[in-house]
Amino acid sequence: MKKVIFDIDGVLLSEERYFDVSALTVWEILYSPAYMGLPSERDDFKADRITEGQIAGCRSVVWGNDALLSWLKACGINSNWDMVHADLITILWLMAETYKKRSGGEKMSFTFHQPQDLKRAGQELMGLPMPKAEDVLDRWQRAVPEGLQGEEVFHALKDAMADTIDGDLSWVDLRSDFWKIHTEAFQAWYLGDDTFISLLHHMPYSAGKPGFLSREVPLAPAAHILSLFRTLKERGYDIAIATGRAREEMEIPFKLFHWYEEFDPYTMATASDAEESARRLGGPVLDKPNAFIFSCAIFGRDPDNYKAYSEETMQPAKDDEIYVCGDSYSDVIGSRRAGAKCIGILTGLEGKDAIPMFEKEGVHYVDRVTDILEKLEQK
């Protein structure tokens, strides 16, 4: 078997729009009257006509000029939904900590099952200072032991905040009702009203957004990437996808750029497959840096194999040539666990700053994805 597997964000498509949307989601959850409705120091913006300048300003404030994003990615957290979750739960933790100090030791508690619960929390938090991005980053650095990856980070945060917040902390978990609320808010921003309704079959809770689908930016001319796919197939390689995006968020831009028809959907693996496996097997969602999504891309999205993928017992043969084009540490680790070799791509969030990580891990790298042909010829 000869196969080249592509991550999407930071490899084929710019991550910038996803990071923009994640910042807008955090902003909306905290400050929109539809959610927490906390007072904002900045002028409010209208979702249906938000400007690029407003987006850039929002992202700078929320993600601390991307310092928080870099920390999360270094911890193997690639899903923007999970990045939003990490930020929001830590903001709530820090605000609850301030409340405890001011009230002489009284603890707050939160229950988040529906958007109205966020409004109640906003009323309770009113008047407390909003933590800055550097406060959130400092808390992560102090609360999360070095070496933890992915969901382990959230377990550490949950354990650490137990002394500050009273009651049930299940809302801190990934895929909790709170996670689902802000994930739908993210999808409303990214998809826009029409596509959101078409895919999810209900109105978004906070409507009026045109979406960012038409603003996706390929990391090389779309026609050049299409030519790369076709050249690889001409040279005997199968091509596949392994992404932390949900399926619909992969399919829409791929169809827009006429890439989709070059692939076999059976090996276009997404976070949706990890979700489906968790429903079938009853275990955790094995997104990156687990091997599961990469194994789906290698062997196919076959539910009969999900258990073997989850246990990492299904590996390529020794003479198979399996390469993963990825931009992050989680791609390096996940591809290795799945029995594939990683080719580093320097168009992700870290850019050329990722070179030391790739070199430390013994990973060959190229400037952009369209340069991989030369690297494959050398192998």
PLM regions: where:
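Non-catalytic, alpha-helical, charged scaffold/linker segments
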Residues: 43-189
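Short amphipathic alpha-helix with an adjacent loop that forms part of the alpha/beta core around
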Residues: 371-379
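Substrate-recognition element of Asp-dependent hydrolases with the DxDx(T/V) motif
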Residues: 22, 74-75, 128, 133-178, ...
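Surface-exposed amphipathic alpha-helices with a cationic face
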Residues: 229-233, 298, 332-336
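Short acidic-hydrophobic, aromatic-tinged amphipathic segments that line or gate anion-handling sites
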Residues: 269-270, 363-372
